[in-house]
Amino acid sequence: MSASHERQPTLDAVAPRFLVGDMEQALAFYGQLGFTSPYHDEGFAIIERDRISLQFNVSDPAHEPPEGGCRVCYISVTNIEALYQQYVPTGALRSPIQATSWGTKGFWLCDPFRNILIFGESIPEEESGTPQGG
């Protein structure tokens, strides 16, 4: 088989890894958001909900980001209004659902360790009035 016919590699999934100060606190917080943990120990955890996963490492003070720094993960969703309502009782929400100029609507929340999760959903063209894709 020639090089031009070889199967090209693909990127299949991404699992952002966040630093957390307390693993049990992180697991409890994300449990309120509907995540479950198929694996965790004192220093590392994998959490999942639907088709996404996140990973945690307990932070090492010697490797902390600069003060005021944070980590951000964008998560594409469906039925964003229902998800927002699920998260209202957690007290973690930092914004209402807002439409963007690029054809999405979304909201964001922050965990106890300054990790930010942005949830977004594409708005159908007929709803947004904004052409998508340029």
Predicted regions and their residues:
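Residues in flexible loops and secondary-structure boundaries
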Residues: 19, 26-28, 43, 55, ...
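Conserved short beta-strand elements that form part of the metal-binding/catalytic scaffold
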Residues: 36-70, 116-122
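Intrinsic-disorder/low-complexity coil detector
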Residues: 8, 15, 37, 60, ...
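Core segments of cupin and vicinal oxygen chelate
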Residues: 10-11, 17-54
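Vicinal oxygen chelate
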Residues: 1-7, 13-21, 45-46, 64-134, ...
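Short low-complexity stretches enriched in small and charged residues
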Residues: 2-12, 27-33, 64, 74-76
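Short, flexible segments with low predicted structural confidence
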Residues: 1-3, 18-19, 58-59
